[in-house]
Structures are given as structure tokens and as C-alpha cells.
Amino acid sequence: MIKHFLEDNSDDAELSKFVKDFPGSEPCHPTESKTRVARPQILEPRPQSPDLCDDDVEFRATLWSQPSDSQQYFCPPAPLSPSSRPRSPWGKLDPYDSSEDDKEYVGFATLPNQVHRKSVKKGFDFTLMVAGESGLGKSTLVNSLFLTDLYRDRKLLGAEERIMQTVEITKHAVDIEEKGVRLRLTIVDTPGFGDAVNNTECWRPVAEYIDQQFEQYFRDESGLNRKNIQDNRVHCCLYFISPFGHGLRPLDVEFMKALHQRVNIVPILAKADTLTPSEVDRKKCKIREEIEHFGIKIYQFPDCDSDEDEDFKLQDQALKESIPFAVIGSNTVVEARGRRVRGRLYPWGIVEVENPGHCDFVKLRTMLVRTHMQDLKDVTRETHYENYRAQCIQSMTRLVVKERNRNKLTRESGTDFPIPAVPPGTDPETEKLIREKDEELRRMQEMLHKIQRQMKETH
């Protein structure tokens, strides 16, 4: 049989044993007329060249010796086993892709890698708002956080110009890349906030700007081309609190209460180098008590998962206890104990920006950039934006119901009910508010009709 032409000491001894034990190698008998059957071929590895890797082994065909009529023929051997076949070219992206795991490994464990590659290719957006009165170091702190100069084109106003200055909204956008990860950072500044003698409702332009970004995103999301939506929603607001005083001022309370339902507020105790360590602790405790007393909802750190390591839990607890963050900003590099650090030089010593014993700058940067940036974006999308979106849909629904009821009454009575005009003698400010509200209602009604048409076309 097979032993007639395969010797035990030959190179094909293992093949003989494999064919004998292999369940799919059924013997094939020649026909009764003893017709000469073509000689079968087997693949035998050629000696490997030093230029070839393990995955590029070539095979050559060798002919067997002339079989006799009584010999049996068998089917070709099975394909290469998983342990000897070439690995996938995606193996470097799949840490679980190994020959030993092929029988039980499906491959969906690579989904995080796929999401990571796609996210890195697309890049990330983050919009940060800084608010507070002038002179608290907002621009310096932002430049220190992201190691870039975002205010190189800023024009400093004189004393007379500051008197007449009103609250403005300015945007500074910059692309930052670090280790192949691209971040499109937008800084929203509020020059003029809190600088006037009468600061009544000076927070209103800031609230209107946040609502405008929500409205623009809602319009883009409701349109047909939703693939390239630019996300300009404000993800975080750093509110700077003056170190001079005994706690929160009425303006601070009014601002945070007006915006805490619209944006994630992170309170900042500015210019911490003007306070002693004991004063910093007392002022932090006082600010936390007043925030709770006035019902202000600042950004809440998410609870740690049960499977988090102890170091991360301790770090998260330290961040929670540091609210409000007492920070120092500086773009100056000074010499301290034989090394160059960013800080401020005083006659009595050096204050280092990145020294945790001097201020909370490192903790703020860790929270804002390294650990909670994505959570800030998630809370903005899932809470603040959804609240605005729900209000818009409810308003549009009420408008549609009101319009349908009016049309129904018109059809039943056969007469039109004209929209009542503005009563005579109304002051100009009230007329302006009424016109703005009517214009807003018309825009929302048009948007609802547009959504309804798109839904009909889709179905």
C-alpha cells in the first residue's frame, strides 16, 4: 500500500502518518480497465532563502515514483493548519490575533482600535469659554494651559475706552497637534464683563451666545447634510472669581445661576499668589458653602467605576476637593534651583505655576485636558443641549397646535381672526421685544415645517 513507495526514513514519513490518520483522505481505486491514472503531486517546502520571511515560503512540486496497479490513490492533504499558516497583515493592529486563539477568537475585541483610528483621523473639537472681570489673568491662564499664544493679535484698550466698553464675545481658534492627535481648540472670551459701573444683566450676551450655538447646531442637525456638522457648542466655562473679598459677589451669583443650566461651569479662584495658603483654604471653603446655599449647579465630576485602580480614585477625590481651583498663570520662564520653570519672581521667592504645592494649575489641567475633557463634551451633548432641544420641540409643537386650532375655527366660522396688533401706547422697548418674539416664533415654525417635509420625503 502506501508503504510500498514511502519509506519510514524518507522526508515524507510524516505525510504518510498524516494521511493515514486524516479522516478525509478516502482511498481512490483505479478503474477495472487499469487505465493509466495521472500521477498525483504533493507540495514539498523548498529550502528557505535568507531573503524570505516565514510568511513567504515557496513550494515546489515533486513527482512520485511509478505506482503499480495494486496501489491505492488518495486525496491531497488538508490545507495548512492555523499554527503554520501566514498571519493576517492586520495582526499588528490586533493584539489578540494569534494562531493559538483562532478557534475561539472572533475579532470584535478590535473595535476599540477601530474607533481609536477613526477618531484620531477625524480629530477632536473643544470649545472653552472664559468669563470674569478684567485683570484676573484669564488670557495668561489659557496660554499656560495649552502652551500656545492665542492672544497675540489682541489690542489693549485705554482707560477711556474701557469706560464705554460693553460686553463682547470674541473667538480665538487654533489647531493643536500632540503625538499625532489633532485638537481644534476654540477659546470664547468675554471682554468687558463686569467692568462697568452698572453690571445689571451683563451676563445676557453670554447666555444669548450659548443659545445661538445650540440653535445653529439644532438647525444643522435637522438639515439634510449632517455629515460635516461643525460643533461650536460651548463645552466648558471657566468662571474667574476675584481673590479680593470674602466670597462670591452678587454678580458672581447672578452669572452662575443664569448659565448653570446652559453650560458646564468650573469656578476658578484667580491670582492665588496674592493669598497665603491658609487664606486660600478659607476662601475655598466659603465659596463652596455659598455655591451650595444659592443652589448653583457647577460641573459635577462623575463617580469612579468600581474596577478603577486606587491611584485613579485618589486622584479623582483630590480633584473634587480642589473646587474652586486656585490657579496662577505665567508665560515667563525663570531660574529656580538650577532649573528653568514657568512662574513669577518676587523679592521673597519664586512662585512656580506647575508646582502642586503652590497652586492648583496642574490639577486644573489634568481635569480639563487629560481626564474629563470627553466627559465635559458628553454632559454638554446629553444634558444641556438636549434640554434646549426639548424646549425647541415643545415650542414648535405648541405653535403647530395653535395654528391648527385657529385654522379649524376659521373654517367653521368662515371668517379670519387677524393677529391682534400691538396695543397703542406701548413703549418702544416692549414693541421691540414683541417683534423679536414674533420673529423667533416664525423661525421655529418654518423649521418645524421643514422637518415635517423631510420626514414625509423619507417615508
Swiss-Prot record:
Domain named Septin-type G is located at 122-395
Record note on modification: Phosphorylated by DYRK1A.
Q: Which GO terms describe its cellular component?
A: axon; axon terminus; cell division site; cell projection; cytoplasm; dendrite; dopaminergic synapse; microtubule cytoskeleton
Binding site residues for GTP: 132-139, 166, 271-279, 329, 344
Q: Which UniProt keywords apply?
A: Cell cycle, Cell division, Cell projection, Cilium, Coiled coil, Cytoplasm, Cytoplasmic vesicle, Differentiation, Flagellum, GTP-binding, Nucleotide-binding, Phosphoprotein, Spermatogenesis
Q: Which GO terms describe its biological process?
A: brain development; cytoskeleton-dependent cytokinesis; flagellated sperm motility; hematopoietic stem cell homeostasis; negative regulation of stem cell proliferation; neuron migration; positive regulation of apoptotic process; positive regulation of intrinsic apoptotic signaling pathway
**Any coiled-coil regions, as ranges:** 434-459
Q: Where in the cell is it found?
A: Cytoplasm; Cell projection, Cilium, Flagellum; Cytoplasmic vesicle, Secretory vesicle; Cell projection, Axon
Lineage: superkingdom:
Eukaryota
Give the start-end ranges of region G4 motif. Answer: 270-273
Instruction: Region G1 motif: list its residue ranges.
Output: 132-139
Asked if the Swiss-Prot or TrEMBL record annotates the protein with the keyword Transmembrane helix, the reply is no
Assigned protein family: Belongs to the TRAFAC class TrmE-Era-EngA-EngB-Septin-like GTPase superfamily. Septin GTPase family.
Return the protein name. Answer: Septin-4
What species is this protein from? Answer: Rattus norvegicus
Q: Tell me the name of the encoding gene.
A: Septin4
